[in-house]
Amino acid sequence: VTTPKGPHLAVLPTAAQGETGSRAQVLQPSGWPLPKGYANGMAAEGRIVVTGGVIGWDAEERLADGFVAQVRQALSNIAEILAEAGARPEHLVRLTWYVVDMDEYLANLRELGKSYRATFGAHYPAMALVQVVRLVEKAARVEIEATAVIPR
């Protein structure tokens, strides 16, 4: 929704049929360029679901081979954690990515986008990307924290 005196608010279809409550809103200040692959901000009301730092390993704690594969597995792990709380990808309001090599991230944007959309569709919450020296699991290349809000 564009208003003459306020920010653009894009209402996301977060409430499924029969679900009640508010919907998440993408916050896009007037005049700002549209971001690609993330939102500048989100507003939502409901039950908050927060993950810890999620890395790209499977249930047997085996890390996927390579950066893109680790991202794919981490995103899948996040989807499973959200499902435990009854949350769906469209309930995501924030992702914080920690990577050990920013150049590796930037060199793989196309594949990362495909992996992201395969897991979460075209829903892009607020995101931050931070390069770190290393992660707790020495061979991990990426760790992602997620916050979701399930509408009431």
Predicted regions and their residues:
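N-terminal presequence-like segments and the immediate start of the first folded domain
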Residues: 1-93, 99-152
